[in-house]
Amino acid sequence: MIVLILAYVAIGDFFSGQPTSTANIYWPLVLIFVLSTAAMQGVGQVASILVSGNTVTLLVVSMGIFYLNALLGNFFVRLHTLHYVYRDVLSQFSIGRFGLEASILLQYGFGRCTGGKVSAVLYSMAIDDDAHYYHCLLMLLANCLLTRLAALALLTYKVRPVKR
């Protein structure tokens, strides 16, 4: 997994036309991808433990997880236009949201727009300041730990013998 992430980010960096020495976003992007991948692996483990090997049910659950991530991930529907329950509660568990927002902040934030200008991309996503990047990293780490602990708890519950 790590080798694939390193290769993916290196290829993207090579074809971006901006060398890493000036952009300085290679290793932070690797960190974002590793945290996002580890968190999504935890979600997959929880889903596979819950459906107990039923492939059709796992496919339906996977599609539901995908659509929920697409809705709450600030991809197609802007979060600031949604109801506060979706925006403030459910979107905190969207791994895609925090991965996207952190990578967008690396690309367009941190003073890249000079002279008091505001990036149109960050404005449309309602990202106000650069400190949101660290919030995204913290939430990715929290989601990773939460999903891994949930998978471990479910696995422990499933394999533990029932005492009657």
Named regions from a protein language model:
Residues 1-164:
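Membrane-spanning alpha-helical segments of multipass transporters and channels
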